[in-house]
Amino acid sequence: MNPTERFISLFKGYNGAHGQTTVIDNHREGKKKAKSFIVREPLTLDLVQDHLDGKLGVGSIPIDETNCCWFGALDIDDYNLDLVSLYKKVENLKLPLVLCRSKSGGAHLFLF
């Protein structure tokens, strides 16, 4: 399984649609003004590859056709966040979370 296939398998969900985001303008330091919308077509490997390459903002809908939720995310918009300290807290508490820095400088915590 290549990295794109692994990524799409982690973020699986509803097969009939996906989200897309188009950046409109810089809103403030670190944050961009964007328009997000639903595209009523499946999320494909090509779309995910474009997302991973930084060409397109896409997202899967985490609730599938059977109402099963496959993942969740917390968006932390604290731009002075000490990512190392947060990582250590997650590890010390043995929380089943994956920590990633967001583009704007905050963080995302994913639960699978």
Model segments located where?
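DNA replication initiation on ssDNA origins
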Residues: M1-F71, Y79-L86
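Short, well-ordered loop/turn elements at secondary-structure boundaries
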Residues: K55, N67-C69, N92-K94, K103-G106
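Catalytic micro-motifs at enzyme active sites that drive phosphoryl/nucleotidyl and oxygen chemistry
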Residues: V58-I63, Y87-K88, K94-S102
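Helical (often loop-to-helix) elements that flank the catalytic cores of nucleotide-handling enzymes
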Residues: L83-N92, F112
